[in-house]
């Protein structure tokens, strides 16, 4: 469905690396995807005003809501950082918030540290259907610290299901981290920048 974006993303990443040696992340990824969406005919409402809605970084002309994320590929999985959930006090509040999907798809521009440590600029454009991440329907367990200052204290929550696992880390502003099996993703495109 989104494979037509790949040549345009590749072109934008090449331009990014003509200017920068570091990876394309955050607002750079948002802007580069915006241009790719427009060039591929999807359109985008993204603007460089840091004023997008919660969970949605840009919306196409046909109303597809996209959350841009970075990620790390490890073996057959991708690890994606998500929302900070501090303002939602209980685990039930956090899961209720997560159940109200603001985005339709997560467009993840992931890297594998092994590629980059060898000097290879390889990205993975990964599309995840947000509906498949049904956090609120999973069995969450408390994580209790085992040593140091967090010993015997609540350090967060986690869930494990067939196609993904997730954790909420109190030490990181209750940030959500999701590890998704690559074969559960809608699309995966390798992009090598030379």
Describe these PLM feature segments:
Residues 1-64, 68-194:
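Nucleic-acid endonuclease domains
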């Amino acid at each position: 469905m989104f494979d037509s974006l790949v040549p345009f993303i590749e072109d934008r990443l090449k331009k990014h690396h003509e200017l920068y040696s570091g990876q394309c992340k955050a607002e750079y990824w948002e802007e580069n995807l915006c241009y790719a969406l427009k060039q591929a005919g999807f359109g985008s409402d993204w603007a460089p005003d840091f004023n997008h809605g919660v969970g949605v970084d840009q919306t196409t002309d046909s109303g597809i809501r996209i959350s841009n994320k970075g990620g790390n590929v490890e073996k057959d999985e991708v690890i994606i950082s998500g929302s900070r959930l501090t303002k939602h006090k209980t685990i039930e509040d956090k899961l209720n918030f997560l159940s109200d999907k603001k985005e339709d798809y997560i467009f993840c521009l992931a890297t594998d540290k092994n590629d980059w440590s060898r000097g290879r600029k390889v990205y993975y454009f990964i599309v995840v259907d947000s509906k498949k991440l049904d956090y609120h329907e999973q069995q969450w367990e408390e994580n209790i610290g085992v040593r140091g200052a967090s010993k015997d204290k609540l350090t967060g929550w986690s869930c494990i299901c067939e196609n993904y696992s997730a954790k909420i880390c109190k030490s990181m502003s209750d940030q959500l981290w999701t590890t998704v099996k690559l074969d559960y993703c809608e699309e995966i495109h390798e992009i090598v920048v030379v």
